Amino acid sequence: IFKNASISFYAININTNQVILSINPHASLIPSSSLNLLTTATWLEILGEDFKFQTTLRYDGEIDAEGTLQGNIYIQGGADPTLGSKMFKKHYYEPNFIKVWVHAIRDKGIKRIKGAVVGDPHLYDDYQVPATWAVEDLGNDYGAGCGGLSIFDNIYEVLFISDQNNKGQPVIFRISPHLPEEVQIINKVSQGGDTRNICVYGLPYQNTRIIQGTVTPKEGSFFVKGSIPDPAYWAAYSLSRELEKHRIKASLKPTTIRREKHNFLQKEQIKNESKPSKQIENEEKVETLLTSIHLSYSPALNSI
């Protein structure tokens, strides 16, 4: 199986710089996900093992006597790659971090929002993925990009149910997390063949996703994972939806800073912190969503 493979290995003693073992050390190879070792090491070296990413809830405008916020709620991203991740269930779901946000908003005396919930990813630029990534990869889970406001690993899951009698197309049974209305999933999966071969097509910020390929009739149910087109919007949508469940309704639909192209003076309300860097790397062995370490200065906003 490795007859035509290219292999390169180079190991040194970091204390003496002596070579321990090398095989084709100068060969040029595509590093793939092993490059995450470099970005993770850089993260720990520059930011430190006790660094915590912060996601901050802010608002602008004033809260009147009737509990109406005459302004917007903002989710200001701090580039936390673990926010809402399934790999950190205890940290983010005991209790659920979005419900914690809702309770903080309610405790502030806000009963209505004459404005919108706005996702703010401006810590990074709008380019989620490098220009060199293959277009056919971008809609899949391994094509998920990084941004100033990430959520749910920037991935959604689609549960399909197959037709055991091989008479029809597998149907979509459930999509998680909940899908915003403007995002459309087109199902072009068919039954046939001996192996599963499915691909998700779609670009960053594009609200149409096409799931295409074949699956064996023997698979009763199966999951397909895709990249979230606009994580900042999904964060705003998820909070807005949870607020409505608690009868706190916004007059405008959720949106993002990128969509609205503006910034308002915002007042800090609550911060959501990740685990320390060392725990993220050591305890969970998470594959970071960051394709590179971006460090930028962001001026402080007025705090309460």
Question: Which residues are covered by each model-predicted region?
Answer:
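Beta-lactamase-like hydrolase cores
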Residues: 1-27, 54, 101-109
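Short active-site loop at a secondary-structure junction
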Residues: 22-42
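Conserved serine DD-peptidase/penicillin-binding transpeptidase domain
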Residues: 45-304
